[in-house]
Amino acid sequence: MGKFLATLILFFQFCPLIFGDYSPSCCTLTIGVSSYHSKPCNPAQPVCSWTLDLLALSADQALQPPCPNLVSYSSYHATYSLYLFPHWTKKPNRNGGGYYSASYSDPCSLKCPYLGCQSWTCPYTGAVSSPYWKFQHDVNFTQEVSRLNINLHFSKCGFPFSLLVDAPGYDPIWFLNTEPSQLPPTAPPLLPHSNLDHILEPSIPWKSKLLTLVQLTLQSTNYTCIVCIDRASLSTWHVLYSPNVSVPSSSSTPLLYPSLALPAPHLTLPFNWTHCFDPQIQAIVSSPCHNSLILPPFSLSPVPTLGSRSRRAVPVAVWLVSALAMGAGVAGGITGSMSLASGKSLLHEVDKDISQLTQAIVKNHKNLLKIAQYAAQNRRGLDLLFWEQGGLCKALQEQCRFPNITNSHVPILQERPPLENRVLTGWGLNWDLGLSQWAREALQTGITLVALLLLVILAGPCILRQLRHLPSRVRYPHYSLIKPESSL
């Protein structure tokens, strides 16, 4: 029985060596001075996942940029899609003796701070560009505005890659490095960046402390500055510590490496210190020494001066525009009345000429009737002379012809109304109203001026207000930021 137990114990001891050590590990993604651990992954569970925020990545990379003048990500780029470009300079072999991949000339090699060519000339397929990476198997990601979920195969952990926003102009680029690592001995105590209720210790009410610090800052500046709190990655947070409190020499675990640590030996806080900071390793440690305080980065911005609003500008402009419109309307009315008067005189002259022509036609018609009567009288006399031969037509051996003069067209011509009554003037409305021509034209001009004045009063202030606010929409005020360390 003892031999069986000894054999069983040895079997369980050497079982990891036989079947492989599948202890939990992860893939660490590094950008700037910050590191992000993936969810547990190993060769048996090869998918390494991250949930990242693009704004936080930009803040992390800004602390230690890989190249100068790198364009940062902002809300302007939120509508554009991401592309992932792996760097395939060396292909690792975890069994030892790594080897280089085949040479590959990529015309879209990343350059700072731009991608070197247009997106439609790049030889990428889908969302990833590499001759050795497959999008669905080796890496895939989903993007929801500024939120990014990356799934990387564990065999590809160790490759650096870049994220690119394909936006017009300079494209924001993130340079990320990955390496396999072990999970930290304890779970990360830091909560997501957007949660300011509890940091490191859930029992500390951070909302009230932040409000107290903001109130003290406002009082120290005599309420002449705006206090801004940067909710970036936790690695960019600042630490205030008291060098008067010693740190225990016992072994402690580093929890957070802040980007800035400021000694404050004579600072009096409205509450006690909450964390333990080790100045030798520049990190927040797990020892309960309580000599420091972790704060998000503060920035002070001067309050913009509010310019006095001139309320007389709009009424003066309205009255000026109204006066100009009224003057233009009066001038137009006078010009129109004069043109109508000249048109009326022209119609009168044309009507006089038509009446004279009508009288001449009537006189000619009467003369023609008299000539016809004379011809008929002579015809009857000649018929009497040639009575014995059967009349004038028989004697001449011709067909008899009789006059047929109609008298119906001349009365119609005389009954037509004058030309002035048949031509419409003004607005095309034949409204008489028992008024003279000048009175009708004055009434039309007055109605036009009233309508124009009402239009200016209703629409003028709105148009002037929009034109007045147009420069402020195009030009944004820029205020210089005062770093918090300058006030400490």
Curated annotation (Swiss-Prot):
Question: Which residues are in coiled coils?
Answer: 341-387, 397-429
Signal sequence span per UniProt? 1-20
State if Oxidoreductase is listed as a keyword.
no
What organism is this sequence from? Human T-cell leukemia virus 1 (strain Japan ATK-1 subtype A)
| InterPro entries, alphabetized | TLV/ENV_coat_polyprotein
In this entry, the parts of the chain located on the Cytoplasmic side of the membrane are: 464-488
What the entry lists under PANTHER family is as follows: ERVV2 PROTEIN, VIRAL ENVELOPE PROTEIN
Q: Return the protein name.
A: Envelope glycoprotein gp62
> How does this protein assemble?
The mature envelope protein (Env) consists of a trimer of SU-TM heterodimers attached by non-covalent interactions or by a labile interchain disulfide bond.
- Attached carbohydrates are found at 140, 222, 244, 272, 404
Known post-translational modifications?
Specific enzymatic cleavages in vivo yield mature proteins. Envelope glycoproteins are synthesized as an inactive precursor that is N-glycosylated and processed likely by host cell furin or by a furin-like protease in the Golgi to yield the mature SU and TM proteins. The cleavage site between SU and TM requires the minimal sequence [KR]-X-[KR]-R.
| Further facts | HTLV-1 lineages are divided in four clades, A (Cosmopolitan), B (Central African group), C (Melanesian group) and D (New Central African group).
| Lineage, broadest ranks | Viruses, Riboviria, Pararnavirae, Artverviricota, Revtraviricetes
Protein keywords: Cleavage on pair of basic residues, Coiled coil, Disulfide bond, Fusion of virus membrane with host cell membrane, Fusion of virus membrane with host membrane, Glycoprotein, Host cell membrane, Host membrane, Host-virus interaction, Lipoprotein, Membrane, Palmitate, Signal, Transmembrane, Transmembrane helix, Viral attachment to host cell, Viral envelope protein, Viral penetration into host cytoplasm, Virion, Virus entry into host cell
Positions of the record's site feature: Cleavage: 312-313
> Per the entry's comment, what about the domains?
The 17 amino acids long immunosuppressive region is present in many retroviral envelope proteins. Synthetic peptides derived from this relatively conserved sequence inhibit immune function in vitro and in vivo.
| Matches recorded under Gene3D superfamilies | 1.10.287.210
Give GO terms for biological process: fusion of virus membrane with host plasma membrane; symbiont entry into host cell; virion attachment to host cell
